[in-house]
Structure formats: C-alpha cells, structure tokens
C-alpha cells in the first residue's frame, strides 16, 4: 500500500485545470485533490465551479476557483501569475477547456465558426501553456496534459473543426515535450473515446437526439461494450502527472474502450 501511495502522491503540488467546473475537468479536480494536490479550478461556469470547490474542501482537499476564459490573453497571464503567487508554485497544468462547435461538413462551416473552435481548443492551450511554463520551471519541473480525443488520432465524418483542433493539441504536447525536457517539464496528451459528459449530452440534445439512446447506440461500436466515464479519464491524468508517470513524456494516452484498436 505504501508503494501505491508513493506512486500517486501529489501532496505539496499545485495543479491548474482549465474547464475544471464539470465533466472530465471536475472529475480530474476531485481526483488530483484526493491525491493531495492543491487544485486551481479555471472556468467560466462560476456556479458549478464554486460548488465543486465546496465539495472538495468538505472532503478535506484544497481548491480555489478563478474565473477564466482561456481565449483572453491578458486574463490568462494574470490568473497564472495569481496562482503562483498565492500558492508559491505551480506543478501541473491540465489543458481541458474545450468546445465542440457546429456539426456541419467543412464546406458548410463559416470561418467564424471554425475560428471559434480553434480559439478555445488550440489558442487556449497555447496561451495557458505559455503562461504556465515559467512557473513550472521555477518549481523545478512539472507536467502538462493536453486533453485531445481519439479523433485527434483517427478521422471521423463529423465536427471537422473539433477534430482538427484535437489533432493540433496532440502535436503541441509532443513539441513541448521535446522543448522542455531539459527543464524537467513533461508534456503528454490524453485521448478520450466516448465519455458521458455534459458537453456531449448537450451536443446530442442540440441535434434533436435523446442522449440515452445516442449513448446506447455508440457503445455498440466500442469493443468493451460500454461508454466511459469522466473518472476513467481522470485516472489516466493522475498517472501522467504523478510520480508514477515520471518517465512519460511526448506520449499519447488513449482511453477509448478499444475503439481505435479496431
């Protein structure tokens, strides 16, 4: 048991999670806090984020919320400075904030629709990583995790702006892994498959589909025969940012129930 505790011990570490108020981000915040990390939850969803902070604190963890739109350059720089100033360090960045965008074929997308997805999903990752790197270096090293998707690796006949953005952050993690390895900063990407999240449920409703029926259909395409949960992804992120993952950088952690192995 002692070995397990040592492998996943995040006591004394500070983790910033973008899009941390719900779904995968919220479950990651709970998981890292349970491992001992102080968690900075960054999101535009104030009500959900404040409730999550209260939940984590009630369970003996430490969490603080900052309102942040990851597309706002000055705000990103300010918030990361405030995190480092308040806690004295930053050790982990989880780039989770993202949107899906319109489910239209490429020739029907407007440039504005395309750009909005890239602004959040790609530029947001760039801005937050850029702001975090000096603080990670000052802490003696750290870990960056970019939330990509299984569709950042394989193609799919829908939401082209989203899929392109997820391929971009996959490569950004590889480049940053090479750039900052000498500073003991690791960078990896996580590639969820079909995960039941509020964002995906809302996407189905927007398309006029019943989420339960949609997930039932989707799981027939998954070798394990079931839809994943945010906890499945949070567990993978915990591995990457903890001592257990100390020799892992530039890697792709695919958590998709076997979908991309077909």
Regions found by a protein language model. Give the residues of each.
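Canonical Rossmann dinucleotide-binding motif of NAD(H)/NADP(H)-dependent dehydrogenases/reductases
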Residues: 9-39
């Amino acid at each position: 048991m002692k070995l397990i505790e040592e492998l996943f011990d995040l006591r004394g570490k500070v983790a910033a999670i973008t899009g941390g108020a719900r779904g995968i981000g919220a479950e990651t915040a709970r998981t890292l806090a349970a491992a001992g990390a102080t968690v900075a939850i960054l999101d535009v969803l104030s009500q959900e984020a404040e409730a999550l902070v209260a939940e984590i604190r009630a369970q003996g963890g430490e969490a603080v919320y900052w309102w942040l739109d990851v597309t706002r350059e000055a705000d990103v720089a300010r918030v990361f400075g405030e995190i480092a100033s308040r806690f004295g360090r930053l050790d982990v960045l989880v780039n989770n904030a993202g949107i899906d965008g319109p489910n239209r074929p490429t020739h029907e997308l407007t440039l504005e629709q395309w750009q909005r997805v890239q602004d959040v999903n790609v530029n947001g990752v760039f801005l937050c990583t850029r702001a975090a790197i000096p603080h990670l270096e000052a802490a003696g090293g750290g870990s960056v995790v970019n939330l990509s998707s299984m569709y950042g690796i394989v193609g799919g006949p829908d939401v082209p702006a989203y899929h392109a953005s997820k391929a971009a952050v996959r490569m950004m993690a590889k480049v940053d892994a090479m750039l900052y390895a000498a500073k003991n900063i690791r960078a990896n990407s996580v590639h969820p498959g079909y995960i039941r999240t509020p964002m995906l449920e809302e996407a189905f409703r927007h398309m006029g589909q019943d989420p339960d029926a949609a997930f039932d259909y989707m799981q027939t395409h998954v070798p394990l025969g079931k839809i994943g949960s945010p906890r499945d992804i949070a567990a993978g992120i915990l591995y990457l940012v903890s001592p257990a993952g100390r020799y892992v950088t530039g890697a792709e952690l695919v958590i998709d129930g076997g979908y991309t192995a077909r």
